[in-house]
Amino acid sequence: MEKKVYSVDGKELRTINLDDKVFGLPVNDDVIYYAINNELANKRVGTACTKGRAEVHGSNSKPYSQKGTGRARRGDKKSPLLVGGGTIFGPKPRDFSYSMPKKAKRLAMKSILSLKAQNDRLVVVEDFTVESGKTRDLVKILDNFAKGERAVIILKDDDSLVKRAGRNIPHLSFLAYNRLRAHDLFYGRKVIMLESAAKNLSEFYGCKEAE
């Protein structure tokens, strides 16, 4: 697959051949759905906790006699039917995380990259950094490719200057080529990929190098 490489000013510089085994696969909706759900589940804290009737503080004595009052039968004041009583089948702390097969996870990432490439939502840009670390300098670059849109920038490595410049920009995510996240990648309206990251992606996913 051929893609144009743009300068930070939005001008076309050259073309790059992207590996079809990464950017030209049939889109697998099921595995994408599975990968996004996996990430969201792994992020859940799962600390919600309620007390059952055995855990609520209070007396265990019977509040009134079983018969003769005309009222409902009560064993103690911690009954779930009473205000201040225990909770029936309430939530308890639990771990929502689960593992996903590595092959399925890799297929999900490649499917999302293929989807973005097929829908012209993937832009390859020459390698750049933001020496000043200023937000306004990065905004000027983004306006050429994803003005007002939710965007994802795929970097070759952890460029702290670019990340510092972009941390004030809403709906902007940074991903390293070897640590992609399905949720951010899928929901980003525009995926801006550095030229070096495009080459590394092909190598990382076990395919031939982009030319």
UniProtKB/Swiss-Prot annotation:
Lineage: Bacteria, Pseudomonadati, Spirochaetota, Spirochaetia, Spirochaetales
A GO CC term attached to the entry: ribosome
Function noted in UniProt: One of the primary rRNA binding proteins, this protein initially binds near the 5'-end of the 23S rRNA. It is important during the early stages of 50S assembly. It makes multiple contacts with different domains of the 23S rRNA in the assembled 50S subunit and ribosome.
Family membership: Belongs to the universal ribosomal protein uL4 family.
Keyword Nucleotidyltransferase: no
Ranges for region Disordered: 52-79
Example GO BP: translation
Species in which this protein is naturally found: Treponema denticola (strain ATCC 35405 / DSM 14222 / CIP 103919 / JCM 8153 / KCTC 15104)
Keywords of this entry: Ribonucleoprotein, Ribosomal protein, RNA-binding, rRNA-binding
Source species, domain of life: Bacteria
Name the UniProt record assigns to this protein: Large ribosomal subunit protein uL4
InterPro entries: Ribosomal_uL4 (IPR002136), Ribosomal_uL4-like (IPR013005), Ribosomal_uL4_dom_sf (IPR023574)
GO MF term set: rRNA binding; structural constituent of ribosome
Record note on quaternary structure: Part of the 50S ribosomal subunit.
